[in-house]
């Protein structure tokens, strides 16, 4: 994964954290599960252990 893509994914993950933390979307039943899924995917993708296992 290129450095630029990693940085974009990290910024996106920070944005998801901020949206969750702010509570602005807490009442939106459609967006909340999508953000949770996006957060999970980004964390898995950016996890060093996941990336190490893919490389080997």
Curated annotation (Swiss-Prot):
Belongs to the microvirus K protein family. Somehow affects phage production, although the protein does not seem to be essential. Pfam families: Protein_K. This is Protein K. Transmembrane segments: none annotated. Disulfide bonds: none annotated. The lineage of its organism: Viruses, Monodnaviria, Sangervirae, Phixviricota, Malgrandaviricetes. It comes from Enterobacteria phage phiX174 (Isolate Sanger). Gene K overlaps genes B, A, and C.
């Amino acid at each position: 994964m290129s450095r630029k893509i990693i940085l974009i994914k990290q910024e996106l993950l920070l944005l998801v954290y901020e949206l969750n933390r702010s509570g602005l979307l807490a009442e939106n039943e459609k967006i909340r599960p999508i953000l949770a899924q996006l957060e999970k995917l980004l964390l898995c993708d950016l996890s060093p252990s996941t990336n190490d296992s893919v490389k080997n």
